[in-house]
């Protein structure tokens, strides 16, 4: 269930960054192309996790807590991403991306507590943190 939510998060992120890259140029465009590519790679990791699901990695209280993660995504992440329209104002677009990245980090960090030995998930969390850092740096330079 939560890997499907993660797939949705990454797919929407890919589309958002792809659209931003089409509206920008130079270094800003390069960053958005890089972020889009990495979001697509994250989606591939989650697809593989779904395919290779190892139930022994999943904590016993998984079913009780999956509802919390789903609710978190529905309340915090998806309302921002449902409208995939990219704002014309680049600062608003970056600000929106920052919020989604922050919420994604929280979601994946909580997910990792139920799948504690998943290196792929930990790697994605670190990459999402780098996305956040890059976006904040970009916001400060505009």
Predicted segments, located by residue:
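Non-heme di-metal
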Residues: 1-142
């Amino acid at each position: 269930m939560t890997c499907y939510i993660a797939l949705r998060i990454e797919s929407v992120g890919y589309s958002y960054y792809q659209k931003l890259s089409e509206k920008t140029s130079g270094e800003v465009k390069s960053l958005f192309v890089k972020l889009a590519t990495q979001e697509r790679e994250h989606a591939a990791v989650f697809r593989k996790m779904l395919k290779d699901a190892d139930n022994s990695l999943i904590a016993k209280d998984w079913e009780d807590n999956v509802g919390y993660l789903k609710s978190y995504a529905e309340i915090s992440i998806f309302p921002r991403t449902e409208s995939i329209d990219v704002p014309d104002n680049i600062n608003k677009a970056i600000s929106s991306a920052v919020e989604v990245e922050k919420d994604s980090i929280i979601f994946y960090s909580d997910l990792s507590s139920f799948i504690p030995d998943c290196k792929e998930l930990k790697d994605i969390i670190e990459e999402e943190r780098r996305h956040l850092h890059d976006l904040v740096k970009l916001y400060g330079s505009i």
